[in-house]
Amino acid sequence: MPSEYASKIPTLIPLEKAGPKGYIRMVFPLELGDSYDADEIFGILKQGLEAAKERAPTLGCEGIPDTEAKQAGVLKAHKYNDYDTIIKKDLRAPGAFSHTYADIKAKGFPLAAFNGDLLCRRFTWPSPGERLPAADLQANFIPGGLIITGCFFHVFGDAKTYYTWLETWAEECRRLQGETGPRNEIPDEFFTDREKHMKPSGRNAGKPEDHSESNWRL
C-alpha cells in the first residue's frame, strides 16, 4: 500500500525555498529494435507515471507563488490535474531526427546527437509566465529506440529525489507488464523527516562564530 503521506501535498523546507528556480535536464536512451508499437509503449509509460504520482506526491505538483510567505518570490507546491506530465513525440519519419538508435549507440551516445530544443520540453531556465511542474517528461520515439528526457525542477528535489521518482516510475511500468511481488515502498521517513527541518529545534543558536570549521576564507 502507498504511504499514508502520499496523498498529502508536501510543504517546502527552507532549503528548497532557497534553491535555484531552474531545471535539471536528463536523457535516458532505450533500445527497442526496428518494429515496436509506440502507442502501446507510451500507454505503459503514462499509466506507470500516474501510478508513481500516487506514491510520490511531489511528482504530480507544480510550483506556484506562496502568497502567505513573508519573502517575495517564494514558491509552494500545488497538485495539478490539468497538465500532462509526459508527452509523446514521434521522430521516426524520414528527416524528423538525424540519427537511428543504432547510430547513436555505435558512436558512444555523443552529446551532439541529443538536440535539447527538439528532445526536451523546456530550457534550463523557465520563461516568465511558464508553469513550473516538478517533472516535465517527453518520450521521443526514434528509429530503433526511445529517448526519454526529463526536466526536473530543482526547487522540488535533488539527485536522490529524482532517482526515487524514476525508480518508482520504472517499477510501476514493470508491474503493468506483469511483474508481481511486493512494491519497493518509499519509506515514511522520506515524508515525516521533512517536518524536522521546518523550524529550529532551539537546542543550538546557529551562530556562524560557533562553527569555525565552516568559516574558511580562501
Q: Where do the language-model regions lie?
A:
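Non-catalytic N-terminal regions of enzymes
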Residues: M1-K207
